[in-house]
Design a protein with these regions (language model features):
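Mature, structured domains of secreted/extracytosolic soluble proteins
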Residues: 2-8, 16-228
């Protein structure tokens, strides 16, 4: 009996010593990170294509979090896309304000990782950091299928993996919607009778607002409009 107790005691002490020794070792935690360049690092390391959007990100003050770990999807316009955009708005990289740069970055950026395989014809499941949803659709261009984003630009290089998300290169700078649903209906003459009905019922004023860019506060409308 004493012999069995001695063996049991020795085994217990041995286990405690092993446990103590193991617990004293430095624990190496596995973080959910990557050795890939982050989004900002990637665009900055490709100045032949992305020097303009890099300058815009720098001016926006968002370089810090775009170079930190997270889960983002960014539609990155090429230098030629930014050049076209700046000509359209009569601006240069120098004359863009910080607020304008921030809005450009925010309309191209989602706090989610979305591959093109998850795109469907219509609204993406996550709003941009600007607060508006982007829409995508497949178009046929000379026998080649391409993805059109917001009816403004096509994806020219997709699913570029970075340490904090994905990049989809686009050939145009995306622009946020500037008109309310009511204004879009008014601008199309084939909805003239429907517009009158909206005004008569008081709903025209309800949908004639572009409110907060905060996605938590913004109200969204879907109108099934009848043509004349």
């Amino acid at each position: 009996m004493k012999k069995h107790l001695s063996i049991l005691l020795a085994a217990t002490v041995g286990m405690l010593i092993i446990f103590y020794t193991e617990s004293c070792k430095k624990i190496k935690y596995v973080a959910n990170t990557s050795t890939d360049l982050n989004i900002y690092g990637y665009i900055k390391s490709n100045p032949d294509k992305y020097s303009s959007i890099t300058a815009i990100v720098d001016k926006s003050g968002y370089a810090g979090f775009l170079n930190a770990y997270g889960s983002y999807t960014m539609f990155v316009p090429t230098d030629s896309a930014v050049k076209i955009y700046l000509a359209e708005v009569s601006k240069t990289l120098t004359t863009l304000t910080e607020a304008e740069a921030q809005n450009i970055v925010k309309i191209h950026l989602l706090e989610d990782t979305l591959t093109t395989a998850s795109f469907k014809d219509g609204k993406l499941p996550t709003a941009t950091m600007y607060g508006q949803f982007l829409i995508t659709g497949v178009i046929n261009n000379s026998g080649t299928s391409t993805i059109l984003v917001n009816r403004q630009g096509t994806i020219t290089s997709a699913n570029i993996k970075t340490g904090n998300g994905l990049i989809h290169e686009v050939d145009r700078v995306l622009k946020p919607a500037a008109k309310s649903v009511a204004e879009l209906i008014t601008a199309d003459p084939k909805f003239s009778i429907f517009k009158q009905a909206l005004q008569a019922t008081g709903y025209y004023d309800t949908i004639n607002t572009i409110n907060s860019t905060d996605p938590k506060l913004r109200r969204w409308f879907t109108v099934l409009a009848e043509t004349d």
